[in-house]
Amino acid sequence: MFLNPNNMNFKETVSSNVYVDKTGLIEYTNSVISTTSKFICNSRPRRFGKSMTADMLCAYYSKGCDSKELFMPYHISSSPTFEKYLNQYDVIRIDVQACIALAKGVFNVVDYIENECIQELKETYSNYDLLRTDTLLGVLHEVHMKTGNQIVV
């Protein structure tokens, strides 16, 4: 649900007659990976494309899919970094609105997200001992230390 989403949401978006190519954002994001500017906040007013942007970034970075053909018609495919980062990362996508109902209320959302993410990470990395910690930050740190993998949230 959270870890390594597929590209179906973005595929649906680009199939729309009104899609406007925003993949230049991926080129920018690629340029700040492994720099001190790597922390990016996708903040926009309501109904201005936050979910579409998140879907695009997930489709591009997630190991949970193969998105090369999906991105070929768009600006990012001409970037020198296009294939370097394409589908190379574990990605955690969090849709807070969807989690409110699943968590049975707004007051349980943070605990719900943390517990579900921890469970998915422990299942995905079951061949590593990730039992030393029960916090999401701790598990993310352990995954990185034991595998070298970077995780996009």
Question: In which residue ranges do the predicted regions lie?
Answer:
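Phosphate-binding site recognition
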Residues: M1-V153
